[in-house]
Regions:
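An active-site-proximal beta-strand-loop segment
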Residues: 144-154
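Adenosine ribonucleotide-centric catalytic and binding domains
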Residues: 59, 65, 145-147
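A short structural micro-motif
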Residues: 66-67, 108, 344
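Extended, structured, electrostatic nucleic-acid-contact surfaces
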Residues: 65-76
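Single, function-defining residue in the core of a domain
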Residues: 1-59, 63, 91, 101, ...
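Active-site- or DNA-interface-adjacent structural scaffold in DNA-acting proteins
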Residues: 76-144
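Glycine-centered flexibility motif
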Residues: 28, 74-76, 128, 349
Length: 422
């Protein structure tokens, strides 16, 4: 294997320990806490997410009580915790500490990208993912039916709506009320906050097709936000004018441009066409797809050979709009990574507070892996595995050195890493 450009230990050192210590004081996260201080919970979750693909409270207990973890983060070897104390702490610990820690780390790590590398990060993919749990465990959530196998125990789901910029989530919200089952209700909550933060309006928001109401399109436009989404091919609209001419490039990759038009969308409430102009790009797959509906029961997505994209950006070419929408798939890959490799497919804590703490810590750990895999040109799974193994090698060497009392052999930065948690 070729030499790594960035070591795992270098990335761990980038975690702003001084700022975490300040956050501990300002948020009072450690009030009445002994063994499980805010910083210890922070590092415990990072270590556990890196160590296992599926984490539980009992695994967190096991991790905390290992000499290896305590050595790495300079915790007294006689310190002990139980899974019960971890459960209680997650349900009551101050959430603000983790929210602000995520913001600080996101800002620090995103600065590692050059100006040229950061340009694609103005393309913000917004989408949602659901995670389910049995009703008797999850305190809040959407009831979505019965357990597989005909059991009588219902299941509940939590919706996570995220704005992904290609590096990490710029913003995320957790929804447990059935009002937010519809993307037309959940996604505007995230979009409004994003647009307010983007004072120069440089971002282009790539939206799931569930975001489809005229009211939502108008709200984004009124806030001067730019978006691209997908609409149904039978959407009622009034053509204002065409943007195509003899110089228009109709090659959109695996799609061929059929039309590029300015339209007025139909307002169902007012029963008339809206006066706001939107741009609709009509394209067709070059290789026809099988549109036969499957014989199995249940709701299935309709397969079509045509794709209609909608945007309020009239400056980009149709090809750039199509390429931007294709990037929407990146957030699906990100969700898959979180669920398969960072224990995001189930609930470590079922309390509302604990769920949000785990969310922020999952995203922080994902950032560590994202930087490592990018710099060392690896995939998600191998990147995470290699990160952890490299970290373990370093800890073994550290423990050996400490046991031999050869502290002079330790670099200053290594000692500083150990001293992060008193």
């Amino acid at each position: 294997m070729k030499d790594k450009k960035v070591r795992a230990i270098d990335i761990l050192r980038m975690i702003p320990c001084e700022e975490l210590a300040k956050l501990s004081l300002s948020t009072k996260v450690d009030y009445c806490a002994k063994a499980l201080s805010g910083e210890r919970v922070f590092y415990l979750l990072v270590y556990a997410f890196l160590a296992a693909d599926e984490v539980s409270q009992r695994k967190l207990e096991t991790v905390f009580n290992t000499d290896m973890f305590k050595t790495l983060f300079n915790i007294s070897l006689d310190a002990k915790v139980t899974h019960g104390s971890i459960s209680t702490r997650l349900s009551k610990i101050d959430l603000t500490f983790f929210e602000k820690a995520y913001e600080v780390i996101y800002q620090r790590f995103s600065r590692m990208y050059t100006k040229e590398e950061a340009l694609p990060m103005n393309l913000i993919r917004v989408d949602s993912s659901m995670v389910a749990e049995t009703c008797n465990k999850l305190k809040k959530g959407f009831t979505v039916g019965k357990k597989p196998g005909g059991g009588k125990t219902s299941r509940k789901q939590i919706k996570y709506t995220m704005a992904y910029d290609g590096f990490s989530a710029k913003l995320t919200e957790v929804f447990s009320d059935s009002t937010y089952l519809s993307e037309d209700m959940a996604m505007p909550e995230v979009l409004t906050q994003l647009i307010k933060k983007d004072s120069n309006h440089e971002n282009l928001y790539v939206l799931d097709r569930g975001f489809s109401s005229l009211e939502n399109y108008d709200n984004v436009t009124e806030q001067r936000g730019k978006f691209v989404g997908r609409i149904k091919t039978n959407r009622k609209m009034e053509v204002v004018r065409s943007l195509m001419d003899e110089t228009t490039d109709t090659d959109l990759g695996n799609l061929e441009l059929q039309d590029d038009i300015v339209v007025h969308l139909y307002d169902r409430e007012k029963k008339e066409f809206s006066e706001t102009e939107y741009r609709v790009i009509k394209a067709r797959f070059k290789v026809p797809r099988d549109t036969t509906r499957p014989a199995n029961k249940g709701k299935v997505k309709r397969v079509e050979n045509e794709v209609y994209l909608i945007t309020n950006d009239f400056g980009l070419t149709a090809k750039l709009i199509a390429e931007a929408y294709k990037k929407r798939w990146d957030i699906e890959v990100f969700f898959k990574f979180l669920k398969q490799n960072l224990s995001f497919s189930h609930f470590i804590s079922t309390s509302e507070n604990g769920i949000k703490v785990i969310l922020y810590m999952t995203l922080i750990t994902a950032m560590l892996v994202m930087i490592y895999k990018r710099e060392n040109e690896m995939g998600y799974t191998i990147g995470k595995f290699s990160f952890f193994m490299e970290m373990q090698d370093w800890v073994v060497k550290l423990m050996t050195t400490l046991q031999n009392e050869k502290l002079s052999l330790l670099a200053y930065e290594d000692m500083r890493l150990r001293a992060r948690i008193p």
